[in-house]
Amino acid sequence: MLQSTARTASKLVQPVAGVLAVRSKHTLPDLPFDYADLEPVISHEIMQLHHQKHHATYVNNLNQIEEKLHEAVSKGNLKEAIALQPALKFNGGGHINHSIFWTNLAKDGGEPSKELMDTIKRDFGSLDNLQKRLSDITIAVQGSGWGWLGYCKKDKILKIATCANQDPLEGMVPLFGIDVWEHAYYLQYKNVRPDYVHAIWKIANWKNISERFANARQ
């Protein structure tokens, strides 16, 4: 019975081992701007700490977890592989979310493309209404998490959603994310999360958001 279970576990994890064996290390992406470029909305100090400390920690932890997962999989240790999943989701999600977040911001992000603006008006009535609705649900996130504007390929519409902790957005293509972990704003905005959320629209990189929207529709 034990031998049969071990053989089954080995079969389950073997395909994963092949994937992990060829996967390269994750690296901290460079920012598309200098740390001070988003002032006064986000301070140099916050941006540097957020990028060099917090995002870097997610990347380092993710690489370590994948090494442990590779070892567990190679040994057919299904129990250990399963036990690593929460940490993989947390740190992997942190890396995914922040990699999107940095590109979503710019000192002069312009305006939504015509195609995106037309879709915003269709699905939300106006850009102001989209901003209000996404801001409201993001401010209301309990504890730490993210607010997202996403594109649902199935329904072919824009939707808004929130995700707890570092959970990545599911069921939609992420277009624009607002990080409401306290490390993203507390040094500057203290406990007044609404001020931070409302201010971040001033540095929304609509060029990047529009490009993500165009790619999502393909």
Curated annotation (Swiss-Prot):
EC class of the enzyme, as a word: oxidoreductase
Record-listed E.C. numbers: 1.15.1.1
Mitochondrion in keyword set: yes
Top-level taxon of the source organism: Eukaryota
PROSITE patterns from the UniProt entry: SOD_MN (PS00088)
Annotated transit peptide: 1-24
Annotated positions binding Mn(2+): 50, 98, 179, 183
InterPro entries xref list: Fe/Mn_Superoxide_Dismutase, Mn/Fe_SOD, Mn/Fe_SOD_BS, Mn/Fe_SOD_C, Mn/Fe_SOD_N, Mn/Fe_SOD_N_sf, SOD_C_sf
Tissue: Expressed in pharynx and rectum. Upon thermal stress, expressed in vulva, body wall muscles and hypodermis.
Conditions for induction: By heat.
Keyword rRNA-binding: no
Keywords of this entry: Manganese, Metal-binding, Mitochondrion, Oxidoreductase, Transit peptide
Annotated compartments: Mitochondrion
GO BP: removal of superoxide radicals
Cofactor(s) this protein requires: Mn(2+)
Cofactor binding note from Swiss-Prot or TrEMBL: Binds 1 Mn(2+) ion per subunit.
Gene Ontology terms, MF aspect: manganese ion binding; protein homodimerization activity; superoxide dismutase activity
GO terms for cellular component: mitochondrion; respiratory chain complex
Function: Destroys superoxide anion radicals which are normally produced within the cells and which are toxic to biological systems.
PANTHER family for this protein: SUPEROXIDE DISMUTASE 2, SUPEROXIDE DISMUTASE [MN], MITOCHONDRIAL
Subunit structure as annotated in this protein's UniProt entry: Homotetramer.
Family statement: Belongs to the iron/manganese superoxide dismutase family.
Protein name: Superoxide dismutase [Mn] 2, mitochondrial
